[in-house]
Each structure stands twice: as structure tokens, then as C-alpha cells.
């Protein structure tokens, strides 16, 4: 059952526990979970071709051994395998490849594989962020399928392009402009159309980096002639 279905059934306590229950963990309890998850990943990574390109036959059994055996690495240490997208060398089967620029690197871009389990974790994380962004106290939040979200994101294959897809698996929030249209527009075009639509449809959410928020504020200023808008 996804977030939309639980909201419809008014299962608010269950929603909070599923997505935000981690806030009740003690620091020791939280770190115990993180250590267990890290050691699961170490085992997977150690047994794949990518991991062995660094480990050279070693197999760390726990986090302490991993720290002793594995040197600090950079993207360049994995680039030959990742840039050629060799799934047989990875610990899991990628369902999508994300990319970003590689400043000063030997190739114009960097790519990173995302498995289904990684996407599931990403989906849960962005849903938790959505809930917490509207929360004033434990268990209290204000999220609905009728909410509107400004699409001020870089589309796929950039990582932020996963955001509307992941959220769409949980709830039918409307993006302004619609994702299918936004991905074919420039950043400036998306912002201008999104703000024009928001003036008519009641914008509820915005997600972006600080630099993006600044660029968006400039777009808003140009649309309002520098007068700004009244926020309720």
C-alpha cells in the first residue's frame, strides 16, 4: 500500500511510523542499523568485479577490516568500469544510470548505476522529506494528492530527475509544469511556465539546491517586475 492509499484510508499513524519512525531511534540504535547495512554492502561489493578491482583478492568480513584493507578512492579509480557501463562487474543489476559532470576529470561526465533497491530507498527518503517539510510536531503533517509541486529540477539522466518518478510511485502530486512536458524544456522555460501555472493553481512545494533556489527567485522577480508576491 503506497502513501496515496494510506492517506485515503486516513492511516496517519502508520504513515508516520513507516516513513519517519527512524526519528524515534536512539543514536546507538541508529548507528547499529547503519553498521549492519554497511556490512551488507561491503559483502556485496567485495564479491563483485568492481570491488575486486580495488581489493585485489582480499575479502573484508566487517567494517573494521574494510577500513584497514581499502584505501581512499576517487571516481577515477572506478571510471573504466562505470563509464563503459559493465553490469556484470557490479554487485547488483542497474535499472537506470545517472550522470553528472566531471569537473577536471578525464571524461566530460560521470555515471552511476542505480539498482531497484537503491530506487526504493530513494523513494522512501524523498517521501519522508515531503512529510517532514509539512510537519509541525511528531505525527502531524499536511500532504495530499491534490498538492502542487514546482518542477525546478534537472531531468534524467541527472539525479534530480528521479525525484518526480520516485514520488509518483507513492502519491499523485501534480508537478508544474507536467513532467512529460518539463523534460523537453530548458531550465528557464520550465521555471517561467511553472510560476505562471503556480499563480493560477496554488503552489504547495518546491525542491532544489540553494543555487537553484536563487535562480528560481530571479525568475520569479522577472515575472513580477521586481515587486515580489504575497505569501500566505
Q: For the regions a protein language model found, what residue spans apply to each?
A:
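Nucleotide 5′-phosphate-binding alpha/beta core
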Residues: 1-99, 103-232
